[in-house]
């Protein structure tokens, strides 16, 4: 029981640790931290709204499309709605605000993942939580890399839109993998696919963000 508690704590702090690592070299780390907290707070009303719609998609449903919608829409797309609210409250579409929007999304997905872990504390199987964490980390790194690259172009807003489209495509792929894993016992194959996507995300982030900073 104690071991599970330690693992759960480690899973919960993984996203904030990834955030601090990703934005350690940001121009204004304090501003990025404030944006992270802002996103985490904005996620609260979305979580309440999400709980209302989740009743239409039972977690033990035998329908592939319902499980896919549950993974993609409720665990992945819902936190994205924090971004327009964040940009609206920031009252700015400048490059700094757009990059800070990624920090806000890190906070939003951290809140969603915390609730995801909390609601499954009694489930001894950690696979779903670990895969959800890998999904979030992989795609947030990809988003940060693409947004950082697009901010160096002449049309940063269009670059952000393109980055979000890639983000959604990656999310659809990840949700598909998780759905297949839900209906099939070959977990090693599907976790390997997510791990491969995570490796690509790390390389993309390294070349788009780290090398540019240095």
From Swiss-Prot:
Keyword Transmembrane: yes
Membrane topology: Multi-pass membrane protein
TM spans (from-to): 4-23, 35-57, 67-89, 96-118, 128-150, 155-177, 187-209
Gene Ontology CC, one term: plasma membrane
Subcellular location: Cell membrane
Keywords linked to the UniProt accession: Cell membrane, Membrane, Transmembrane, Transmembrane helix
The name this protein goes by in its record: Uncharacterized protein TP_0473
């Amino acid at each position: 029981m104690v071991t599970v508690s330690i693992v759960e704590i480690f899973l919960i702090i993984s996203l904030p640790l990834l955030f601090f690592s990703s934005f350690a070299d940001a121009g204004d780390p304090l501003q990025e931290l404030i944006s992270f907290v802002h996103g985490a707070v904005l996620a609260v009303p979305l979580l309440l709204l999400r709980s209302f719609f989740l009743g239409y998609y039972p977690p033990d449903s035998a329908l592939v499309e319902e499980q896919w919608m549950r993974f993609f829409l409720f665990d992945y797309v819902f936190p994205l709605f924090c971004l327009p609210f964040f940009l609206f409250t920031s009252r700015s579409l400048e490059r700094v605000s757009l990059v800070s929007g990624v920090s806000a999304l890190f906070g939003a997905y951290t809140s969603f993942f915390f609730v995801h872990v909390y609601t499954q504390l009694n489930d001894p199987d950690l696979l779903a939580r670990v895969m959800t964490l890998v999904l979030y980390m992989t795609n947030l790194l990809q988003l940060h890399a693409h947004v950082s690259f697009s901010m160096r172009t002449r049309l940063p807003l269009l670059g952000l839109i393109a980055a979000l489209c890639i983000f959604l495509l990656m999310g659809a792929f990840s949700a598909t993998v998780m759905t297949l894993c839900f209906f099939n016992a070959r977990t090693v194959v599907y976790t390997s696919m997510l791990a491969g996507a995570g490796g690509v995300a790390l390389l993309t982030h390294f070349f788009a963000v780290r090398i540019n900073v240095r």
